[in-house]
């Protein structure tokens, strides 16, 4: 049996539908909004047009069946790892993962594929970053804490609206003495650079893109 499925060979939506107590399908195509709903794998009504729209795309919402699964609560860390892997294989596709239970958002946006991947090509926010709801950098704060245990306590006591928490390992690297290639190959340094959002180096560094104007 699989602990985590990496793919269902093209029949994923059918399997998800069969294992869900409810599934809603909304399709934007040919200027119209099409919708259909299923319960326990069976259609509630035929595919119907419910409105007009100029954009295209598909939205699938599903509720895992408690009759099939003993655990129906999603683990956001597992989802984040899987979507990060998918971002490597789908260059140019922007993937956004939102956990509305704790106002957490991950963004995976890889401009190039695996053939040109480097340590800093991954523009997705770090998986351990508990981001804040505030989008204005001037009002946003980033707290760097040592270790996951401290990170857990900090996340519980923070103000989610304006305070972000990023757990890091202690004494990660002396970047003043390290070579540049060793510095960017450090997972912790790369995580910090990605979280700050302003890049590194003469060509990529842009202080205007700094995501937090207060870093503690």
Curated annotation (Swiss-Prot):
Keywords: ATP-binding, Cytoplasm, DNA-binding, Isomerase, Nucleotide-binding, Topoisomerase
Superkingdom in the source lineage: Bacteria
Cellular component GO terms held in the UniProt record: cytoplasm
Domain spans labelled Toprim: 140-216
Top EC group: isomerase
Subcellular location: Cytoplasm
Record site: Interaction with DNA: 171, 174
Transcription as UniProt keyword: no
Gene Ontology terms describing biological process: DNA topological change
Catalytic activity, reaction form: ATP-dependent breakage, passage and rejoining of double-stranded DNA
Enzyme Commission designation: 5.6.2.2
GO molecular function: ATP binding; DNA binding; DNA topoisomerase type II (double strand cut, ATP-hydrolyzing) activity
Note: Few gyrases are as efficient as E.coli at forming negative supercoils. Not all organisms have 2 type II topoisomerases; in organisms with a single type II topoisomerase this enzyme also has to decatenate newly replicated chromosomes.
Function: A type II topoisomerase that negatively supercoils closed circular double-stranded (ds) DNA in an ATP-dependent manner to modulate DNA topology and maintain chromosomes in an underwound state. Negative supercoiling favors strand separation, and DNA replication, transcription, recombination and repair, all of which involve strand separation. Also able to catalyze the interconversion of other topological isomers of dsDNA rings, including catenanes and knotted rings. Type II topoisomerases break and join 2 DNA strands simultaneously in an ATP-dependent manner.
Family (UniProt): Belongs to the type II topoisomerase GyrB family.
Subunit structure of this chain's protein: Heterotetramer, composed of two GyrA and two GyrB chains. In the heterotetramer, GyrA contains the active site tyrosine that forms a transient covalent intermediate with DNA, while GyrB binds cofactors and catalyzes ATP hydrolysis.
Name of the protein in question: DNA gyrase subunit B
